[in-house]
């Protein structure tokens, strides 16, 4: 059996007034933020699910249930750091991560380098092993209408000897 595992995660949240917009651990200037029990950072939530899934640890709902008041307004970074510790405890190392944020607005290109650095810090990874991309749906669907933001993440783990 190979010592490598791949995980995929997805998350989406509605944009609402009165909240900060957090994406990949970075505050993004926008009049609306993502709705959620925590900070709503769908990029980090997708990445956490990818990490946990690859390590055979389930998903965020198992480890950080929204019904648990401990996670009310928790930062995505705190979830990611905890997920990384679980992956490490299972004997895996993170080789690389790849996150795609799907949003019609705001333009995310000015934030990509900060997002890569923030995720790298949480995971103790060099920035060149962290990819963050931004895509739009060119007006199609809920993200295209500006109703929300979604993210997809993929990770590669290797088993330590």
PLM segments and residue spans:
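SAM-dependent methyltransferases
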Residues: 1-3, 160-161
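Pyridoxal 5′-phosphate
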Residues: 132-136
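RNase III-family endoribonuclease catalytic core
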Residues: 2-114, 118, 123
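Short acidic capping loops at alpha-helix termini that bridge into adjacent secondary structure
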Residues: 126-129
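Mobile acidic interaction elements
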Residues: 139-141
């Amino acid at each position: 059996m190979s010592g490598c595992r791949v995980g995929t995660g997805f998350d989406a949240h509605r944009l609402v007034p009165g909240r900060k917009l957090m994406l990949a651990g970075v505050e993004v200037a926008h009049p609306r933020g993502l709705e959620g029990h925590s900070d709503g950072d769908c990029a980090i939530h997708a990445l956490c699910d990818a990490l946990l899934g690859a390590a055979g640890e389930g998903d965020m709902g198992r480890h950080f249930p929204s019904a648990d008041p401990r996670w009310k307004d928790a930062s995505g970074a705190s979830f990611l750091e905890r997920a990384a510790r679980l992956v490490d405890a299972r004997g895996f190392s993170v080789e690389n991560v790849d996150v795609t944020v799907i949003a019609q607005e705001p333009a995310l290109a000015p934030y990509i380098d900060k997002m890569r650095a923030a995720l790298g810090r949480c995971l103790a990874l060099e920035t060149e092993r962290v990819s963050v991309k931004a895509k739009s749906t060119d007006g199609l669907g809920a993200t295209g209408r500006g109703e929300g933001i979604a993210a997809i993440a993929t990770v590669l783990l290797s088993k330590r000897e």
